[in-house]
Amino acid sequence: MADDQNCAPELEKADPSGEDGVDAKPDRSSIISSILGKKKKNASACPVKTARDRVPTYLYRMDFEKMGKCIIINNKNFDKVTGMDVRNGTDKDAEALFKCFRSLGFDVVVYNDCSCAKMQDLLRKASEEDHSNSACFACVLLSHGEENLIYGKDGVTPIKDLTAHFRGDRCKTLLEKPKLFFIQACRGTELDDGVQADSGPINETDANPRYKIPVEADFLFAYSTVPGYYSWRNPGKGSWFVQALCSILDEHGKDLEIMQILTRVNDRVARHFESQCDDPCFNEKKQIPCMVSMLTKELYFGR
């Protein structure tokens, strides 16, 4: 029929076993179903193509004019009201990260001792910039922290509030591009005693005008430690995580995929670092970084 010619072809039949549901409480699920039901009545007869209808590509495009912007927020000094100590050694981290990301082709900007409002403002403005000619975006947060929180010089703010500016529905020029966040901060007060292990052997996309992707897609969060634990920093050398990250990026930043890079960072922090403190409660402790990836493709900085 003529009316069907402009409709995108439906490539996959609906599952006859039933409709998709949500993992929510019964009261929330019924509300969501009601909302979705209303939307269905008003929906166009033309099906919207989803990402699974496209020919898959497994590498992020990096052939843009620029690699992208890298913002480093380096919080060293804190207002007395926060009760937080000076983060000695963080300037070493900021300097090493500046050189490292610049060598990868990023336009790097460092901001020191930012308030919570300043951090929000910086990242909001960055998300409003035109990233059309950039391959990706990176941000490094160096500060004190708690689980899901990061300290500005004057208090704490949720990490989610900082990163949400770059969601797909808010920052359109970074849509389907990697948004990388590296976070050097404590995530709790637990200590990792480690466990003795036996030594062993060392072991271009086609245009498609109508499809949707999740707004939280294409994010990567690389945390210096796992939820609930301290993150260690040496006053003379910088934090363990940043030392390892910069070392691996210098060695393999242009030839390994990002998850391979971060896996090697995990290994280096786990094997090569151990705390040395006069206080026996804090002596001989270990640390393991943690990454949370919503990336949808492989990322190579050197391609």
Curated annotation (Swiss-Prot):
Annotated site location: Cleavage: 36-37, 45-48
Composition bias, Basic and acidic residues: 10-27
Record note on modification: Cleavage by different proteases, such as granzyme B (GZMB), caspase-1 (CASP1), caspase-8 (CASP8) or caspase-9 (CASP9) generate the two active subunits. Its involvement in different programmed cell death processes is probably specified by the protease that activates CASP7. Cleaved and activated by initiator caspases (CASP8 and/or CASP9), leading to execution phase of apoptosis. Cleavage and maturation by GZMB regulates granzyme-mediated programmed cell death. Cleaved and activated by CASP1 in response to bacterial infection. Propeptide domains can also be cleaved efficiently by CASP3.
Activity regulation description: During activation, the N-terminal disordered prodomain is removed by cleavage. Concomitantly, double cleavage gives rise to a large Caspase-7 subunit p20 and a small Caspase-7 subunit p11. The two large and two small subunits then assemble to form the active CASP7 complex. Can be cleaved and activated by different caspases, depending on the context. Cleaved and activated by initiator caspases (CASP8 and/or CASP9), leading to execution phase of apoptosis. Cleavage and maturation by GZMB regulates granzyme-mediated programmed cell death. Cleavage and maturation by CASP1 regulates pyroptosis.
Record-listed E.C. numbers: 3.4.22.60
InterPro entries reported in the protein's UniProt record: Caspase-like_dom_sf (IPR029030), Caspase_cys_AS (IPR033139), Caspase_his_AS (IPR016129), Pept_C14 (IPR002398), Pept_C14_caspase (IPR011600), Pept_C14_p10 (IPR002138), Pept_C14_p20 (IPR001309), Pept_C14A (IPR015917)
Annotated stretches, region: Loop L4: 274-288
Positions of the UniProt region annotated as Exosite: 38-41
Active site: 144, 186
Site description Involved in allosteric regulation, residues in chain: 187, 223
Disordered: region residues: 1-27
Subcellular locations according to the entry: Cytoplasm, Cytosol; Nucleus; Secreted, Extracellular space
Principal place of residence: cytoplasm
Reaction(s) catalysed by this chain's protein: Strict requirement for an Asp residue at position P1 and has a preferred cleavage sequence of Asp-Glu-Val-Asp-|-
The keyword Oxidoreductase is assigned to this record: no
Gene Ontology MF terms: aspartic-type endopeptidase activity; cysteine-type endopeptidase activity; RNA binding
Location of N-acetylalanine modifications: 2
Residue span of region Loop L3: 226-238
Keyword Hydrolase: yes
Segments for region (Loop L1): 76-87
Example GO biological process: proteolysis
Keywords from the named record: Acetylation, Allosteric enzyme, Apoptosis, Cytoplasm, Hydrolase, Nucleus, Phosphoprotein, Protease, RNA-binding, Secreted, Thiol protease, Ubl conjugation, Zymogen
Domain notes: The exosite polybasic region mediates non-specific RNA-binding, acting as a bridge for RNA-binding target proteins, such as PARP1. The exosite is also required for interaction with non-RNA-binding proteins, such as Hsp90 co-chaperone PTGES3.
Protein name, UniProt field: Caspase-7
Organism: Mesocricetus auratus (Golden hamster)
Name of the gene: CASP7
